């Protein structure tokens, strides 16, 4: 007779849930923020909107972004004039781009992550793919399975239309899969392209213009599992605890809708205030059981929705100037890449920690936190990624 309790127990991993590899990828087209307003208003035939262009220039100047990477080149946009108009029917053209570029960019990051991991891809048991850039069937998870040559029976999870908080969501799901499936090795891929949100400017919808100043394209990939193989798998961060919550009284703060005109985004001005007002509660829930109340003593990875959010969080928690260094660096060099952003920040942090000779992947600190913020307003907390010695 089979012992059901024992059967359940043997299916669970015993060791810590660990990130073994991180890699990123971007399209080759690099856009300098300082000259982007000229390009944007020219390509959208909006140069006559002088005052609006001046507003957009100020947005770009305040964004704290130096450059972004975008799949959409001048040539592609000229071939698709409806994509350049404000609210012109264009979903078919956008979808044609999305179904190719999201898996392609995701593959580029995944190949790098698998190489760093150092194990054959046949050992990947689960695949999580996340994108806010569109929907299709079979999904980007299926396309990636084919592009990477993964086993046909790999267990796939496709997450569409989640938004900027989803970098935390994929880690939460990967943690649960790794700890409840002994021997699991989870490939996580977030791939985002702005082809679905790009459109010309409007005098009456400045929140749309904010998105045009912030969003960039990028993909990030991770390998997650439990019980590292000694001398072969190298732990980078441990996933300790996760949570998701909806901020009270935040309905409509951030939302997006897939329409015939593409994906439209709407933001309330008080998004930074909502985030900063609710972050204390999330931190207490996460760190009180660990006896941690000094949030300057942990390393920070926060989704860089924009500089105003980071400024208010820093002020609210009385942060030291360098506390958000990795987050601000990624915002500066890549812009807001939605779900992929926090994974880029993880990569930036562990690389700089090694370059600076620090004792852990988390800027020399033992404990840390990862936050994702997005539509809902939804807050994802990953408590946090405990760093291990380099």
Swiss-Prot record:
CDD domains (alphabetical): CHS_like
EC id: 2.3.1.74
Stored Gene3D superfamilies: 3.40.47.10
Pathway noted in the entry: Secondary metabolite biosynthesis; flavonoid biosynthesis
Active site feature: 164
SUPFAM superfamilies attached to this UniProt entry: Thiolase-like
Catalytic activity, as annotated: (E)-4-coumaroyl-CoA + 3 malonyl-CoA + 3 H(+) = 2',4,4',6'-tetrahydroxychalcone + 3 CO2 + 4 CoA
Superkingdom of the source species: Eukaryota
UniProt cross-references to Pfam families, sorted A to Z: Chal_sti_synt_C, Chal_sti_synt_N
Enzyme class: transferase
GO molecular function terms attached to this record: naringenin-chalcone synthase activity
Keyword list, A-Z: Acyltransferase, Flavonoid biosynthesis, Transferase
GO biological process: flavonoid biosynthetic process; polyketide biosynthetic process
Family label: Belongs to the thiolase-like superfamily. Chalcone/stilbene synthases family.
Role played: The primary product of this enzyme is 4,2',4',6'-tetrahydroxychalcone (also termed naringenin-chalcone or chalcone) which can under specific conditions spontaneously isomerize into naringenin.
Descriptive protein name: Chalcone synthase
Organism annotation: Onobrychis viciifolia (Common sainfoin)
